[in-house]
């Protein structure tokens, strides 16, 4: 048996191990297409600001081809460094594209104010054609989808500080798009707006240079469809992280935005580790979780072997990302989601509608959190030197805190309760039909008698005993239906008062002409 277990562990490790690169074969290269990237040919701030202005106009042109749009975006992304050409050549290693750098300098003879640097060759016409200044129709179209403030005609500046602020504002809006361009483009607008408000409050961006929605949609769609552009952006992030010492302000802002980009598309894997394993609830000892715990261990080792590109595997379209999906550990993932919904209010908005979602293990996670509230881990307490008296004090405080949190009914536990009017009879209520209808009426009658004879506390227990137990919970309402025992008791008392008042009103209905209306304050006081 011991040999079998060792073989099983070795099999799991080798199964999830990435392929070993061998030196016998060469690298597989695809059919490359050429991307032209304009870069400043001198150190003048005027040249850089004018190039930035022309590239922003170019991206807003709806007639721009995909490779040309990618080259313009790469040119903008590399404008904040001192030598953009060296940066692009150092970090670019793409088997699908071949990048050609074109140095741009100022020119008074071209309509765009720029020309391509060359030795004795007039390149003004080519520069105007590239920046779409040869056709007046396309020139007018290039102004659409630019800044929300229509009073801004251009962004050419002379001082480095002003240029860095404008460039940083534009770059922040581009980098934020990468966070959900691949994983959730339909719901990206709200999170992008929150990031924009954050950086505006921190004075990292200038609010007047907010780009139009259509311009941002064009860039988001290009990021989503062009893997080469995403490879360049990830390589630039990693290059900035490797830079020692103090970094430029724009580089620090890119690293800050990276916190929203990193591990995009890996929420199931990360949250399962966070809520399913790190919480260390005793439910992990179930036999059902043994195989999936071994799978998660292998995936964590594989994640570390992938190195610095592991958090970006979904953005880089790495085929190994499928191993990290929740379908590889459905029971443990369902349990972790139940734990997460109880511990964090932000988890209540997640979509659990997956084919492999198991409501039973979801409720197991919820119940595990509720019944373990206020308990102190003996292992952790011994490591921290917490005495038994301190542990009891912590448990008491934690229990009061949990009760206060439940009484406020925050997050996914908040349920909507509809109250009856005095003139509404049982015949007007929605009919369940058959045995369920008779069961509900019987439970109501028993609850009223129990309330009148024994009081609200024992009546609530009698009502709880007649609750149906065979009905499965809906996925979206699982967290609302399962309440804490004390919270359920309060709700039961309130509903029993409601039913009692409704019964009294039915008996007095013939004597009174005006129906009695009860609100929540009268019922719950």
UniProtKB/Swiss-Prot annotation:
Residues 1-403 are annotated as: Ncore. Residues 433-452 have a biased composition (Basic and acidic residues). InterPro entries: Paramyx_ncap. Residues 1-36, 373-391 are annotated as: Homomultimerization. A motif (Nuclear export signal) lies at residues 425-440. Residues 404-525 are annotated as: Ntail. This is Nucleoprotein. It comes from Measles virus (strain Edmonston B) (MeV).
């Amino acid at each position: 048996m011991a040999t079998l277990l060792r073989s099983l562990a070795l099999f799991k490790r080798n199964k999830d191990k990435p392929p070993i690169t061998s030196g016998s074969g060469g690298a597989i290269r695809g059919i490359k297409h050429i991307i032209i990237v304009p870069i400043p040919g001198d150190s003048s701030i005027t040249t850089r600001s004018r190039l930035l202005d022309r590239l922003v106009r170019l991206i807003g042109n709806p007639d721009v081809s995909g490779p040309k749009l990618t080259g313009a975006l790469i040119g903008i992304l590399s404008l904040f460094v001192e030598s953009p050409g060296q940066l692009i050549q150092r970090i670019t290693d793409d088997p699908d594209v071949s990048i050609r750098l074109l140095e741009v300098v100022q020119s008074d003879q071209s309509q765009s104010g720029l020309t391509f640097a060359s030795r004795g060759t007039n390149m003004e016409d080519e520069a105007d054609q590239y920046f779409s200044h040869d056709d007046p129709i396309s020139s007018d179209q290039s102004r659409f989808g630019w800044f929300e403030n229509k009073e801004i005609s251009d962004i050419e500046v002379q001082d480095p500080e002003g240029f860095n602020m404008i460039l940083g504002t534009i770059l922040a809006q581009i980098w934020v798009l990468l966070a959900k361009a691949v994983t959730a483009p339909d719901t990206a607008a709200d999170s992008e707006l929150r990031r924009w408000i954050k950086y505006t409050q921190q004075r990292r961006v200038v609010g007047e240079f907010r780009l139009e929605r259509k311009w941002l949609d064009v860039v988001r769609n290009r990021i989503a469809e062009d893997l080469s552009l995403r490879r360049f952006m990830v390589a630039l992030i990693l290059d900035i992280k490797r830079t020692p010492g103090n970094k430029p302000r724009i580089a620090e802002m890119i690293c800050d935005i990276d916190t929203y980009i990193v591990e995009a598309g890996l929420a199931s894997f990360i949250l399962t580790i966070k809520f399913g394993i790190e919480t260390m609830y005793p439910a992990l000892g179930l036999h059902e979780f043994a195989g999936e715990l071994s799978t998660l261990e292998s995936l964590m080792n594989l994640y570390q072997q992938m190195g610095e590109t592991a958090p970006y595997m979904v953005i880089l379209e790495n085929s190994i990302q499928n191993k990290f999906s929740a379908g590889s550990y459905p029971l443990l993932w369902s349990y972790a989601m139940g734990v997460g919904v109880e511990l964090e209010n932000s988890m209540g908005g997640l979509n659990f509608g997956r084919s492999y979602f198991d409501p039973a293990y979801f409720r197991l996670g919820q119940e595990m959190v509720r019944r373990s509230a206020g308990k102190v881990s003996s292992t952790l307490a011994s490591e921290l030197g917490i005495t038994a008296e301190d542990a009891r004090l912590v448990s008491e405080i934690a229990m009061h805190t949990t009760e206060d949190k439940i009484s406020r009914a925050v997050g996914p536990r908040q349920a909507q309760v509809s109250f009856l009017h005095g003139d509404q009879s049982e015949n007007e209520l929605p009919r369940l039909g058959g045995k369920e209808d008779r069961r509900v009426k019987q439970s109501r009658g028993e609850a009223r008698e129990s309330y009148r004879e024994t009081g609200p506390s024992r009546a609530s227990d009698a009502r709880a005993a007649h609750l149906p137990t065979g009905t499965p919970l809906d996925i979206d309402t699982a967290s609302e239906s399962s309440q804490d025992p004390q919270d359920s008791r309060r709700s039961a008392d309130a509903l029993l008062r409601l039913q009692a008042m409704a019964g009294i009103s039915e008996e007095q209905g013939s004597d009174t002409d005006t129906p009695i209306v009860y609100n929540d304050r009268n019922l719950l006081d």
